[in-house]
């Protein structure tokens, strides 16, 4: 795909994203598919601040539970752009239920594909140029979306990432791992 096609695709996604009203479950499903693609495929990490808030509770397989989704998400997202700049999010399914008064609940299944860039910084040095294919691991994500202080926010998120496949695939390619785990430790939700 050439530059013009990439820009046209991005513009079409942005057009939907910035004009969506979240009035039906179908719009919610489409909005969060577009949202995910804009962040991961078009490297728009700043969009994290559109739907995550200080009250977001995130439950991540292998890490635990923390509060403060927008900052944690940005810290985890930015370094991955260098490691695999051509990552694609392949949506297998996304489904939403709910309404504009009570809020929405959606679930999605994705798999990723791309290349670990030889120019990308990693814990072990530069990436090795290896590829990861669609369907090599799946990400399951479930979110609750409600109004917080007058705007739509993800208030609770549950993520299962196929961690073993990711660990094998990304051995020595996540320079931010120690830092991000220390960051999460400070955000852990206290048990009541």
Give names to the regions the model predicted.
Residues 83, 90-94, 121, 141-146, ...:
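Catalytic cores of transferase enzymes with a strong primary signal for eukaryotic protein kinases
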Residues 107-150, 163-177:
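Exposed beta-sheet edge and beta->alpha loop/turn motif
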Residues 33, 45-118:
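A solvent-exposed, acidic/Ser-Thr-rich amphipathic alpha-helical stretch
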Residues 57, 95, 153, 158-159:
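Residues embedded in well-ordered beta-strands within globular domains across many folds
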Residues 1-51, 184-192:
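Short, low-complexity N-terminal intrinsically disordered segments enriched in polar/charged residues
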Residues 2-15, 129-132, 137, 155-192:
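Low-complexity, intrinsically disordered terminal/linker segments enriched in charged
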Residues 27, 31, 72, 137:
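Soluble or luminal CAZymes and related metallo-dependent hydrolases
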């Amino acid at each position: 795909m050439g530059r013009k096609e990439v820009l046209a695709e991005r513009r079409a996604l942005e057009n939907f994203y910035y004009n969506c009203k979240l009035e039906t479950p179908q719009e919610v499903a489409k909005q969060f598919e577009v949202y995910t693609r804009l962040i991961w495929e078009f490297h728009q990490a700043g969009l994290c601040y559109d739907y995550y808030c200080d009250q977001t509770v995130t439950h991540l397989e292998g890490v635990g539970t923390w509060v403060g989704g927008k900052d944690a998400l940005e810290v985890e997202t930015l370094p991955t752009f260098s490691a695999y700049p051509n990552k694609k999010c392949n949506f297998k399914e996304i489904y939403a239920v709910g309404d504009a008064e009570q809020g929405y609940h959606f679930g999605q299944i994705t798999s990723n594909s791309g290349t670990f860039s030889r120019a990308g910084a990693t814990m072990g040095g530069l990436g090795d140029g290896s590829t990861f294919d669609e369907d090599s691991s799946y990400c399951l994500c479930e979110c609750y979306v409600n109004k917080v202080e007058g705007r739509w926010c993800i208030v609770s998120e549950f993520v299962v990432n196929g961690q073993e496949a990711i660990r094998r695939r990304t051995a020595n390619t996540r320079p931010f791992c120690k830092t991000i785990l220390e960051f999460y430790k400070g955000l852990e939700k206290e048990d009541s």
